[in-house]
């Protein structure tokens, strides 16, 4: 999976937080503090679409939405990183060793549900 640059991550955060698909102009308004040109927002959205992070509808103006939820994206990243580990068991052990008691309890519950 392709990585996200800082501006791409900011745009994705806005898309994930939106209640539905949004236009480039709406995204630009939400990023007004950044002083971005509309063409810049379009460029970022095009790159995100090429990387597989967003999809758009055919309406005019185009409205964009994330291809996956934030949680689905995080799960995809975890699977990708685990797939790159030379020793999956060791990687999982190190991961589990770093979780707190509540997260460990949640992991046990999820594993028990299968």
Per-region residue spans from a language model:
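Short alpha-helical segments that sit at the start of domains
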Residues: 1-14, 18, 69
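Short, cationic-aromatic polyanion-contact patches
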Residues: 4-7, 59-78
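Short helix-capping/turn signature of helix-turn-helix
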Residues: 17-18, 33, 98, 113
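Amphipathic alpha-helical dimerization/coiled-coil segments
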Residues: 76-114
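A short, conserved structural fragment
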Residues: 49-59
């Amino acid at each position: 999976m392709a990585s996200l640059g800082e501006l791409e991550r900011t745009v994705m955060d806005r898309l994930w937080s939106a209640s539905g698909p949004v236009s480039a102009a709406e995204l630009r308004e939400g990023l007004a503090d950044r002083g971005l040109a509309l063409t810049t927002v379009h460029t970022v959205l095009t790159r995100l679409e090429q990387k597989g992070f967003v999809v758009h509808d055919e309406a005019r103006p185009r409205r964009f939405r994330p291809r996956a939820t934030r949680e689905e994206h995080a799960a995809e990243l975890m699977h990708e990183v685990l797939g790159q580990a030379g020793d999956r068991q060791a990687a999982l052990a190190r991961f589990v060793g770093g979780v707190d008691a509540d997260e460990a309890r949640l992991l046990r519950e999820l594993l028990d549900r299968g």
